[in-house]
């Protein structure tokens, strides 16, 4: 009886470990996060733009935040919200900005949506593994910086 119980326990353990391995998703390594942040900062400095850079994981949880000198305090929250929306909705926040401009007011009813360019998902093998959000200059300029940061991983 003890032998059968032990065998069943071991079988259950192996099967659950196998199931967990199948459901594992690639995450951003800290070195990648730093490379994304550095690329964003370099792109911003190229045009003398001071911004906030936020990087989140696939669940929208903050991994990195940087506020350059002279940026308005509100940009801290805006950058985080852009990154989170891009991660959770798996699309750039420019999609929401464009939708709102074309009259789709219903987008604003979606929780966590921010209709301002500058949030871009980080995609690896077709899966969103995080996102970057930038705020501090115009939304188009925020988008330029965010997209440049994503290009650092290619």
Regions found by a protein language model. Give the residues of each.
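N-terminal secretory signal peptides that target proteins for export/translocation
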Residues: 1-2
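Flexible, solvent-exposed loop/hinge segments and secondary-structure transition points
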Residues: 20-154
